[in-house]
């Protein structure tokens, strides 16, 4: 069986591009700072780097990456302060404000809440110029 080097190079380039896009999210500054509060519905702790869905608008769930301050994980009933970096903040501009409580979800199941204490990305700030 002969393998086309051109086809293999194209596949490799596509995979590298996908990895680059995923790593760009990890290398961006966080979008918001929050207080995480988990409600006990998870069986296991949420580890730093956890990527659940967040209900940022009444009709919009988006994935975000959690980073926790001073702890590696938060127990199922625990709280901690940290940040969320959203995957596509340009899709839901001007929808957040300090004090807003957004649900943290695994599918339709709410596993906790994040109360916004700071907004770093002006595009997301409801009162910002974005």
Model-identified regions with their sequence ranges:
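C-terminal effector/interaction modules appended to NTPase cores
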Residues: 4-130
